[in-house]
Amino acid sequence: PGGDISEPVSQATLRIVKVFWGLSSSLAYKRHFPAIDWLQSYSLYISRLQEWFSDNVSPEWNELRAKAMRVLQEEAELNEIVQLVGVDALSWKDRLTLEVARSIREDYLHQNAFDEVDTYTSLAKQFAMLRLILEYQEKGNQALDAGANLSDAVSYTHLRAHETLA
């Protein structure tokens, strides 16, 4: 059947190339391109590339990448809870995590190949964008620890409105 990668030829290929990009029909239906599932996909070259990214982009690159992956994994777990009992059952920190994950997905990972600006982004800009998104989470968590709630903060929809005006 389609999508079965457990058969011997696929397994041998995966051992040789050491990379797997799992395509997601649900992402494609949502018009999220490239429709690569970040939770199923992997590369065994990450350890080899860490030094290069640290030297050529930023020493923080690998840490930010790992944090972003944790946020996306946490989002998948939280979405299961949301489907069962609703978003109101989540703590403010969990809601913030969902907002940050949405920003990673929609603002960072999503591309429009037909848009001149979106077709290509330098590594320096990618780093700055990811750092900004994760800094939003850090500052948001600090505000929540200080007694604020997420509705007091600038919401993602307000950020979108400002982006449209800019």
Placement of each model-derived feature along the sequence:
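Conserved small/polar residues in nucleotide/adenosyl-binding loops
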Residues: 157-164
